From Swiss-Prot:
InterPro entries: Cytidylyl_trans, KdsB, Nucleotide-diphossugar_trans. This is 3-deoxy-manno-octulosonate cytidylyltransferase. Pathway: Nucleotide-sugar biosynthesis; CMP-3-deoxy-D-manno-octulosonate biosynthesis; CMP-3-deoxy-D-manno-octulosonate from 3-deoxy-D-manno-octulosonate and CTP: step 1/1; Bacterial outer membrane biogenesis; lipopolysaccharide biosynthesis. GO terms for molecular function: 3-deoxy-manno-octulosonate cytidylyltransferase activity. Activates KDO (a required 8-carbon sugar) for incorporation into bacterial lipopolysaccharide in Gram-negative bacteria. Its EC number is 2.7.7.38. It is found in: Cytoplasm.
């Protein structure tokens, strides 16, 4: 099978509820979105583009030498924004894999981006994502920590996702896995995904990835050792600034 040709797309929007203007939040003299863009470039997978809906984000990315594309401000999800950006940038289909990197991960290790792409080497995989083993008891029962049900044997680093939930699953003794919301898609799989109606379980759990499972799509999970810091609040922003302090 021919090797995939990926593009990295970073969806960014200014209307975050808990941290308005998040993409342009200053971290040591640069907007947060630039930190994410730079780390995505360092992953070395392919071109990197920011998918935004505000001119100020577009201008900031271009001012730092990056590429951005304007998208519809009313998309219901980041996946829809990513797909619009891909269609605009690459209508002829040169890129057959898309890596979706969240725009609020300024401390993201480029190796994590490479890790999420790797499972697509298996021909039957539609979507790839990441998990890490939960070691904190509070996280195990926290509904804001999404759990992935994946049967990883000892020493195994990639496994097939059977379900995602906010509940503590599976039952009984054994590891639980924290789902990390980075994704890599085959192009035709992303196109299909955004065309599907919202699923029953997706609506119930408020987890978009369940739409893929409800429609028979295969999601494989790569096991990584750390959870990247997502910046959702002013306190998170201060943590990111501290971590990135020169």
């Amino acid at each position: 099978m021919a090797e995939l040709t990926p593009i990295i797309v970073i969806p960014a929007r200014m209307q975050a509820t808990r941290l308005p203007g998040k993409p342009l939040a200053d971290i040591h003299g640069e907007p947060m979105i630039i930190h994410v863009w730079r780390r995505s470039v360092q992953a070395g997978l392919g071109p990197v583009v920011v998918a935004c809906s505000e001119a100020e984000v577009f201008d900031a990315v271009h001012a730092h030498g990056g590429q951005a594309v304007m998208t519809d401000p009313d998309h219901p999800s980041g996946s829809d924004r990513v797909w619009e950006a891909v269609r605009k940038l690459d209508p002829e289909g040169r890129f057959d894999a898309i890596v979706n990197v969240q725009g609020d991960l300024p401390t993201l290790d480029p190796q994590i981006i490479r890790a999420v792409f790797a499972p697509l080497a298996e021909p039957g995989v539609d979507v790839a994502t990441l998990v890490t083993e939960i070691t904190n008891e509070e996280e195990r029962t926290n509904p804001n920590v999404v759990k992935a049900v994946v049967g990883l044997r000892p020493g195994q680093r990639v496994g097939r996702a059977l379900y995602f939930s906010r509940a503590t699953v599976p039952a009984n003794a054994g590891p639980h896995y924290h789902h990390i919301g980075l994704y890599a898609y085959r192009r035709d799989s992303l196109e299909r995904f955004v065309s599907l109606p919202q699923g029953v379980l997706e609506s119930r759990e408020k987890l978009e990835q369940l739409r893929a499972l409800e429609n028979g799509m295969r999601i494989d999970c790569a096991l990584v050792d750390t959870v990247p810091l997502g910046v959702d609040t002013p306190a998170d922003l201060e943590r990111a600034r501290a971590l990135l302090k020169a």
